[in-house]
Amino acid sequence: MQGYLSVQETAAKWGITPRQVQILCKENRIVGASKISKVWVIPSDADKPTVSCEVDSAETKVDLSHAPYTMHEFFAGSGLVAYGLKGMFSPVWSNDINERKATVYRANFLHDHFVLGDIKDVRGSELPTAHLSWASFPCQDLSLAGNMKGIFADRSGLVWEYLRVLDETLEKPKILALENVSGLLVANNGENYKNLHEALRQRGYRCGAIFLNSEIFLPQSRPRVFVIAVHDDVIIPEEIMDKEPNWLHNKAAVALGKTLDGWVWWKAPKPVKAPATLESILDQNAVFDKDDVLRLVPQRIMDELNSYESVIATGYRRTRNGHQQLELRFDGIAGCLRTPAGGSS
């Protein structure tokens, strides 16, 4: 619609979240904002109101500097890895190509170590030294939604740019961690992982893959593969290394580990505490636009929902055969967050 922006476009323009834009619209704080076919539209020349929930002060930002070890953070996104490893690893350099994710990252954390730009333009010789190098490289070409084009395709193939940067560093990190979807191990009879494993071995690292699903920690399913590599000149403590497969290894990892040179069977204690239930952690007073939500629900799913007196179901969009579709779960587990174009978020 000429002269108007969507909620998402307005959020990107103002550097806030789409949810914040929706709240401002519902509170009538954006002059000229209106609903057309149950969807908010905002005048392109509308002034940005003051947003009380913006993160813009040093007092609200997370300080990641107090940690005994340092890390590089490739494909950093909004900084979930940095947050997860806080207290143990402090990022000295982080990178992503997405401007909106960069805005969120910088709003969340103190210190200016984030470099916005294409990894193809990164030169390893310019990076500070670090103990750990983390790369959550793109998953699209290793997932079903991306038709499993493979590790040499355009998106997932950016892992080779990561290794090129690693080759250029003046001092290689002693530990590498690469994260991706289960297709890294499963697709193409494991050839994707075999190529990556060989590349890491050529660079002087012993490595192994583990498979974790977040549902053992919380009520959300997010199956992921973590490839952990340690340089050959580092002595690996026996406490974290097994002699055979364990609960961290799915069938694909077991099959690969039994045939590959330099494979490490990583070991860790298995969580024994049951995760919190979905119902116990839901925010019952969350602000949302009921019309916008119901607009996404097809009639066949509404019929199923209406068959319950009261139900908590999680829904997310997935791309199958090139088309978006809504999927619901009724088992108390949330599925992976999904991007509209496919792949996990």
Short names for language-model regions:
Residues M1-Q20:
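Polyanion-binding surface elements
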Residues V7-Q8, I30-D56:
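Short helix-start
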Residues F74-A76:
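Class I SAM-dependent methyltransferase "Motif I" SAM/SAH-binding loop
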Residues S78-M88:
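Conserved SAM-binding loop of SAM-dependent methyltransferases across substrates and taxa
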Residues V92-D96:
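Conserved SAM-binding motif I beta-strand of class I
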Residues E99-T103:
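Short alpha-helix immediately C-terminal to the canonical SAM-binding loop
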Residues H111-D118:
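Conserved SAM-binding strand-loop segment of SAM-dependent methyltransferases
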Residues V122-L132, L142-R329:
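Class I S-adenosyl-L-methionine
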